[in-house]
Amino acid sequence: MADKRVLIVDDEIHIVHVVAIKLRNNGYEVISADNGAEAFELACSEKPNIIVTDYQMPVMTGMELVEKLRQHEQTKDTPVIMLTARSFAISQEQQEQLQISGCLSKPFSPRELLENIEDILYQRKLMVDN
């Protein structure tokens, strides 16, 4: 399960709970945080294969988290999916600049998120294998 570790970051506990159930039922190990600062610490210590983060959170926003992740050697290449209630808030340019692997607007389906995670991890595995 070492290649199926997901860090979920959201201050809405019910979203974390629903997503965690879906991922665990599909063989993923789930760790979670309710703000960007805690998530950064977990990303460094737990080394998730992918991070799913909310855009708008207290303490440190999702964008601030991604900026910090990209500056740190251990986390600079970790794929990130951004969840947002404001799909217009993240431009294509920002996504490319910060290497955000995907964005989903709330409300989203846990199945849709799972498919995104699996696609991103599969593509990443193909890149590593080649």
Report the location of each language-model feature.
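Active-site beta3 strand of CheY-like receiver
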Residues: 46-52
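Receiver (REC) domain active-site loop signature in two-component systems and cognate sites
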Residues: 57
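Short hydrophobic/Thr-rich beta-strand motif most characteristic of the beta2 strand and flanking loop
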Residues: 27-34, 42
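Conserved Asp/Asn-Gly motif in the active-site loop of CheY-like receiver
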Residues: 33-37, 110
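C-terminal output helix
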Residues: 108-118, 125
